[in-house]
């Protein structure tokens, strides 16, 4: 997976820089999202693995994408096809989104709780994280009943384990040392 990220990173950076320069960040994110989904399609994936010339492959890919690609998006697909890199489009999208979030000062935060959080609790957690991280926070909430109570928050390198399971684990470690 890290090899795909290494290959995808320069393409994502080039697309990102171009999108910022043209003021078309959201349009490029939409184009790359669509192209990524096309590249993940089973039939298209078989085409990408086949022995088709890069020009033909680019033409086929662009025709599948149709109106979803503007002129610059089509050029981007042509360059990727010439270099045999259309298979890494999902990785390009991933890297592009990371760059976009960094640029827009947005961070994804995974919040795992023992029970479903209310809208007010989500708003409170989001506000506190935004103040602490000085970024806009996008919450991804999930439920894990094995936590017993409380929440675990993961945002970038930050991990806050305020679950009953986590507290019991730390208490157990303290008692054993």
UniProtKB/Swiss-Prot annotation:
Which species is this record about?
Aliivibrio fischeri (strain ATCC 700601 / ES114)
Q: Oligomeric state and partners?
A: F-type ATPases have 2 components, F(1) - the catalytic core - and F(0) - the membrane proton channel. F(1) has five subunits: alpha(3), beta(3), gamma(1), delta(1), epsilon(1). F(0) has three main subunits: a(1), b(2) and c(10-14). The alpha and beta chains form an alternating ring which encloses part of the gamma chain. F(1) is attached to F(0) by a central stalk formed by the gamma and epsilon chains, while a peripheral stalk is formed by the delta and b chains.
Spell out the family assignment given in the record's similarity comment: Belongs to the ATPase delta chain family.
Q: What does this protein do?
A: F(1)F(0) ATP synthase produces ATP from ADP in the presence of a proton or sodium gradient. F-type ATPases consist of two structural domains, F(1) containing the extramembraneous catalytic core and F(0) containing the membrane proton channel, linked together by a central stalk and a peripheral stalk. During catalysis, ATP synthesis in the catalytic domain of F(1) is coupled via a rotary mechanism of the central stalk subunits to proton translocation.
Subcellular locations according to the entry:
Cell inner membrane
| Protein name (Swiss-Prot/TrEMBL) | ATP synthase subunit delta
Enumerate the InterPro entries for this protein: ATP_synth_OSCP/delta_N_sf, ATPase_OSCP/d_CS, ATPase_OSCP/dsu
GO terms assigned for molecular function:
proton-transporting ATP synthase activity, rotational mechanism
Cellular component terms, GO, for this chain's entry? plasma membrane; proton-transporting ATP synthase complex
Write down the Pfam families for this protein, in alphabetical order: OSCP
Looking at the record's lineage, which domain of life comes first?
Bacteria
What membrane topology was assigned to this protein in its record?
A: Peripheral membrane protein
Keywords of the record: ATP synthesis, Cell inner membrane, Cell membrane, CF(1), Hydrogen ion transport, Ion transport, Membrane, Transport
